[in-house]
């Protein structure tokens, strides 16, 4: 008997996106799979949707995932989306599933972790304490200070040319409102946002940044978000400098933190080199698939 597919709606849509969901259940009403479709709403990404499909291992290869996928794709089409992205671990059942259903592999990511108990803190301190003529370091917790908000929002364009290979991710348009909103979302869920930034001493503007999100408990693993430098300020080692500062601050502020997590496109050789220099150890690879509608 084919699974029953029940459509669900997101009770709390965000300003930047909203989600649709589908639950697959067997003849007795027992859940056996799910699909979530995130529909981006911000300028520059209105064409895009992001998909997650999961099926109980005992129910795989029986058409459950296909039924869920069909429902999600139909919804994306009805919303006028042109691309659906889906990420899965390399070599996993999801990898095989997406490849067999018309998705094409567009990006490979390496996930890595820095175990803080084993980190070479002397090396990290040496990098963090280097002097970079024409630049100075600053940092803040949570929402960006008002005096830096405008140039910090402007510096987010440093992410625009991040290596994404063939991914149709669009261009994220950042302004002060969006920067503040993103920080508020992190705070609302109980996590702590720490941002390190490099300022141009000539005018005090933000030219690079590195974000780290730590669990509110200060335990477990922190997650690096964006690290980027404006194109006109690259080539001075600012990315390595900022990430070393971020590690050092995390260690000092959260002594019970176990590690730091990061993920980097395999084609982003510069950032992978920074991670290697700082002692991050690869844990696994993920692949980004795209379905063109």
Model-derived regions, located:
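Conserved GNAT-fold acetyl-CoA-binding loop/helix
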Residues: 1-14, 160-181
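Conserved N-terminal entry element of GNAT/NAT acetyltransferase domains
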Residues: 1-10, 118-146, 150, 161
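Conserved beta-hairpin
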Residues: 7-10, 18-35, 193-208
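A conserved beta-turn-beta hairpin within the catalytic core of GNAT-like acetyltransferases
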Residues: 34, 40-52, 59-60, 215-225, ...
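Conserved catalytic-core motifs of GNAT/GCN5-like acyltransferases
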Residues: 39-42, 85-89, 104-118, 276-293
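Conserved acetyl-CoA-binding loop-helix of GNAT-fold acetyltransferases
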Residues: 55, 61-74, 99-100, 229, ...
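Conserved beta-strand-loop-alpha-helix junction that forms the acyl-donor binding cleft
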Residues: 60, 85-94, 230-234, 260-272, ...
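Conserved GNAT acetyl-CoA-binding A-motif
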Residues: 76-89, 250-263
């Amino acid at each position: 008997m084919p699974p029953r597919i029940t459509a669900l709606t997101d009770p709390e849509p965000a300003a930047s996106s909203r989600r649709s969901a589908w639950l697959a259940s067997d003849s007795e009403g027992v859940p056996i799979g799910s699909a979530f479709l995130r529909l981006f709403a911000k300028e520059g990404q209105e064409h895009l949707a992001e998909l997650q499909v999961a099926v109980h291992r005992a129910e795989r290869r029986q058409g459950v995932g296909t039924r869920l996928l069909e429902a999600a794709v139909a919804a994306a089409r009805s919303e006028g989306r042109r691309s659906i992205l889906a990420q899965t671990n390399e070599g996993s059942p999801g990898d095989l599933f997406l490849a067999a259903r018309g998705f094409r592999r567009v990006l490979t990511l390496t996930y890595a972790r820095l175990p803080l108990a084993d980190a070479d803190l002397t090396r990290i301190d040496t990098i963090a304490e280097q002097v970079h003529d024409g630049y100075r370091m600053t940092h803040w917790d949570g929402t960006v200070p008002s005096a830096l908000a405008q140039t910090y929002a402007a510096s987010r364009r440093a992410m625009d040319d991040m290596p994404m290979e063939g991914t149709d991710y669009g261009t994220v348009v950042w302004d002060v409102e969006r920067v503040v909103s993103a920080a508020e979302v992190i705070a609302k869920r109980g996590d702590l946002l720490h941002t390190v930034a490099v300022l141009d001493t000539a005018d005090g503007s933000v030219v690079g940044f590195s974000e780290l999100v730590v669990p509110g408990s200060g335990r477990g693993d922190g997650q690096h978000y964006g690290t980027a430098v404006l194109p006109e300020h690259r080539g001075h080692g600012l990315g390595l400098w900022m990430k070393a500062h971020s590690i050092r601050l995390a260690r000092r502020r959260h002594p019970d933190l176990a590690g730091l997590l990061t993920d980097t496109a395999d084609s982003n050789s510069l950032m992978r080199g920074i991670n290697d220099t700082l002692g991050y150890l690869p844990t696994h690879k993920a692949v980004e698939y795209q379905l063109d509608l």
